[in-house]
Amino acid sequence: MHLARFPALFLGRLAGFLSRTLGVGGGTTLPGVVAQFLDPGLVSTLCARLERGVILLTGTNGKTTTARMLALMLREAGWSPIHNRAGANLMEGVATTFLYASDLRGQPRGDSGLFEMDEAHFPRAVALCRPRLVLLHNLFRDQLDRYGEVDTVAGRWGQALRTL
């Protein structure tokens, strides 16, 4: 076990507990922020430990519904996916999902990862998780102040996918 892993996992979980207990957020983002600050390689390491690999999905609409249906199908097929079902679809949310779905030694309690990702954060997720399967949904003009035009987002997706 990497020395930074235990403090990152423990203190990340503690941050989530305090966030929920004190009513400061829902505990879906802050734990991941803390864990990644303490161990920047946490997500990539835990993704690599998933026997069946990672499935990433992104798009403007339908991510949560599709991810939940796919999670049910995977479970019916005998898989044990780690899934960010709370809808926290930035890397911090993926890190938080791993915090609660891994033991304090950093061993995931699942055989696969199923992560819905925000359109702008998808390229980073590809780099960190090295997915075996990618599902791309529709792409519409959404949050232009943050993402720019559809062509910009699509170009970033293409660059990320070419690295696989």
Task: Write out the residue ranges for each language-model feature.
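Phosphate-binding loop of NTP-binding sites
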Residues: 3-164
